């Protein structure tokens, strides 16, 4: 049975890549709050300017702002009768409780666990195409076209590091994650709606583990 999912885990745990793999396989809407915010920043909207200031300081966007953005998207999907995967939300206990209050059905949380040293390595060497959002890694999954994305044959598009992937920013984000996000994990454990997955393997391997545990496929 296809059901709505939340992907939880520290920055660099593979939430986005794994969610994309599964959403493509099952034709589920992949909602990345990070991607929504990055688009707002790129377009220099009032929201984007506010978010940029927060992100550049290595902090998370306030709950009330994030909640309203997610709620708007969920209302759209409900009208379309579509299932979804939430990636990057909720991040705090308050967000988790807000989400539970606005959903008609119980949601399953998938926690991706990975050691801190591997997280720092993953993020420090991560590169992303600004156009198609393809993700590369300078050590483990480099682009076959060097510093350019493989998917744009006519117009060379340079892959780039995300602004919040500096080592200093990574350490700040991990500190905030440990302080704010872990209480939320206990919340889902208590509600018996948490599946824990070891995320040290490749994206395809991790996705297959999620599929086996969640969809019995």
Curated annotation (Swiss-Prot):
Annotated binding of ATP, by residue: 12-17, 126, 135-136, 201
Keywords, in A-Z order: ATP-binding, Cytoplasm, Kinase, Nucleotide biosynthesis, Nucleotide-binding, Transferase
Pathway(s) the chain acts in: Purine metabolism; AMP biosynthesis via salvage pathway; AMP from ADP: step 1/1
Subcellular location, record wording: Cytoplasm
Residues covered by region (NMP): 32-61
Top class in the EC scheme: transferase
Residue ranges of the region described as LID: 125-165
Residues where AMP binds: 33, 38, 59-61, 88-91, 95, 162, 173
Entry's free-text remark on domains: Consists of three domains, a large central CORE domain and two small peripheral domains, NMPbind and LID, which undergo movements during catalysis. The LID domain closes over the site of phosphoryl transfer upon ATP binding. Assembling and dissambling the active center during each catalytic cycle provides an effective means to prevent ATP hydrolysis.
Name by which UniProt lists this protein: Adenylate kinase
UniProt gene name: adk
């Amino acid at each position: 049975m296809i059901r709505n999912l939340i992907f939880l885990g520290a920055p660099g745990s593979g939430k986005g890549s794994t969610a994309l793999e599964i959403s493509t396989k099952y034709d589920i809407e992949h909602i990345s709050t990070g991607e929504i915010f990055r688009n707002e920043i790129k377009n220099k909207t009032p929201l984007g300017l506010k978010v940029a200031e927060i992100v550049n300081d290595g902090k998370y966007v306030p709950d009330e702002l994030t909640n309203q953005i997610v709620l708007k998207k969920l209302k759209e999907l409900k009208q379309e009768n579509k299932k979804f995967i939430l990636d990057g939300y909720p991040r705090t206990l308050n967000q988790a409780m807000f989400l539970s209050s606005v959903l008609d059905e119980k949601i399953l949380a998938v926690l991706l666990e990975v050691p801190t040293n591997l997280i720092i390595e993953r993020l420090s060497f991560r590169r992303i195409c600004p156009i198609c959002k393809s993700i590369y890694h300078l050590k483990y999954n480099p682009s076959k076209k060097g510093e350019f994305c493989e998917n744009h044959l006519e117009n060379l598009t340079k892959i780039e590091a995300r602004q919040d992937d500096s080592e200093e920013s990574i350490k700040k984000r991990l500190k905030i994650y440990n302080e704010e996000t872990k209480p939320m994990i206990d919340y889902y454990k208590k509600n018996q709606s948490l599946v824990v997955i070891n995320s040290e393997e490749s994206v395809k391997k991790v996705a297959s583990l999620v599929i086996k545990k969640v969809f019995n496929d």
